[in-house]
Amino acid sequence: MRLMSRIAFALLATAALVAGGPASAQQKLKWAHVYETSEPYHTESVWAAAEIKKRTNGKFDIEVFPASSLGKETDINQGMALGTVDMIISGPSFAARSYPRIGIAYYPFIFRDGDHLLAYSKSPVFKEMIDGYREKTGIQILAYTYYGARHTTSKTAFTDCAGMKGLKIRVPDV
């Protein structure tokens, strides 16, 4: 992750946390994700947690729980709603379980490439999606990033959704 992206990420997270309520004693927060400790999502989460603690003079102490240590992606999404987890890294397919419209970003062949997806994330349409998600769930989306696309492998080549007609495939629990 580029330095500016890291800084923007930490600032967004810090601003959201600081705006969350009146001054008080240190708050301990749980940040969960499903990625292994060698993955950039984990290393940047640890970095952001340290930056947030530093920039808020210790007001927020965030412990990062990697590698599904607090549950699978479905579990940590439910944990956000239940209040057992404070922050997560998750994808639109899981958010769509609570607010189906936001799942559009997960459909195959919706975006031409990563730049197209990032342009969507800065659009009024995406703002409408995250506002609707927040109204429905009470959960605020702080940042959006491109981590690559899912891939489908088969013995038959296809370049669009029509080419997948009739294929029997296994899919993750999304």
Regions found by a protein language model. Name each.
Residues M1-L11:
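Bacterial N-terminal signal peptides that target proteins for export
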Residues W47-I62:
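Signal peptide-proximal N-terminal region
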Residues N57-D61, I76-S90, K168-R170:
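Alpha-to-beta junction loops
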Residues A49-A50, D86, G91-V174:
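Contiguous mixed-secondary-structure segments that line small-molecule binding/active-site clefts
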Residues K30-W47, A67-K72:
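Extracytoplasmic "Venus flytrap"
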Residues I62-V64, I141:
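Generic structural signal for residues in well-ordered beta-strands
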Residues V18-A25:
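Sec/Tat signal peptide C-region and signal peptidase I cleavage site
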Residues F65-Q78, A157-T159, P172-V174:
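Short helix-initiation/N-cap motifs at beta->coil->alpha
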